[in-house]
Amino acid sequence: MNLSSLPFRLLAAAVALCAIAAPASAERIKDLAQVGGVRGNALVGYGLVVGLDGSGDRTSQAPFTVQSLKNLLGELGVNVPANVNPQLKNVAAVAIHAELPPFAKPGQPIDITVSSIANAVSLRGGSLLMAPLKGADGQVYAMAQGNLVVGGFGAQGKDGSRVSVNVPSVGRIPNGATVERALPDVFAGTGEITLNLHQNDFTTVSRMVAAIDSSFGAGTARAVDGVTVAVRSPTDPGARIGLLSRLENVELSPGDAPAKVVVNARTGTVVIGQLVRVMPAAIAHGSLTVTISENTNVSQPGAFSGGRTAVTQQSTITATSEGSRMFKFEGGTTLDQIVRAVNEVGAAPGDLVAILEALKQAGALTAELEVI
């Protein structure tokens, strides 16, 4: 790994986020929240992929593949003797998963993903035999079958040598499953619609209630908690859909995101929120020293000028490392200035991560620090 390029990645990530985290503008409710109960549901199943060109499971190491094939053949009226274990290379046991979209009706197709369970080299060219897809309640909601589309490529020699491009053991089947059972209607029998924010924020909830009341009349919406807004609605499904169509396009300005720093300790990437500030502090990390100081200046207007006395903060950041020159920064004490100071002296990403953690423990970093 070229460590000399890492400081520039740190700085680029910090500057990029500061550019992204601009003051919040008006956004639609449909971009900030989802309607309660309107969501997808996970489906999972097990099946067999056949027709592989010698790239299937090594059945001596995956006996369940043979057992599954015997069971399938038995259901089709073909009896395989119990003491016979066919050694096949064109069959693979697979897991199937999909998402049942909201309001899906019987007969509608959905996409599925097929993944090898055992030691198949590649699923390219294979066909999935009919397999049921079940929900968390154990009920069958869809039936899957079709020809796989595999983006990767894999091959294996007799001596065990192997070459692969991308991931050939996973494929997709567009419209590969047919919905057989519909989910219960979430719109039936209630006089309220609930809107759940994607992120918990009391300010956004308050502003959403105000925006809805302004558009539909006072008392239409009420805040339930930091995530949920309840909206009065008619019980007729058609009228509720019309209300939602108008409701999801109401615009409001969401609250500011909380001050947060996200650090990836493995790659050295640091993402800094716009509102992150650092209190005065001095840090010594090995041969690296970072000093933060803050001075208070008072601006006194002239007599009879009508002006007001103003207090301004002037911050100074310096970073030194053994054998390196000193760097000095003027202005507000923001975290991206510390990142710049640390990068200028050529510190490794691990140094910056350790400094951020120490600042948080000392109470000098007034933001949430998340290490991923």
Swiss-Prot record:
GO terms for biological process: bacterial-type flagellum-dependent cell motility. It is found in: Periplasm; Bacterial flagellum basal body. Residues 1-26 form the signal peptide. GO terms for molecular function: structural molecule activity. Pfam families: FlgI (PF02119). Keywords: Bacterial flagellum, Periplasm, Signal. Its main location: periplasm. It comes from the Bacteria. GO terms for cellular component: bacterial-type flagellum basal body, distal rod, P ring; outer membrane-bounded periplasmic space. Assembles around the rod to form the L-ring and probably protects the motor/basal body from shearing forces during rotation. PANTHER family: FLAGELLAR P-RING PERIPLASMIC PROTEIN FLGI, FLAGELLAR P-RING PROTEIN. The basal body constitutes a major portion of the flagellar organelle and consists of four rings (L,P,S, and M) mounted on a central rod. Belongs to the FlgI family. This is Flagellar P-ring protein. The gene is flgI.
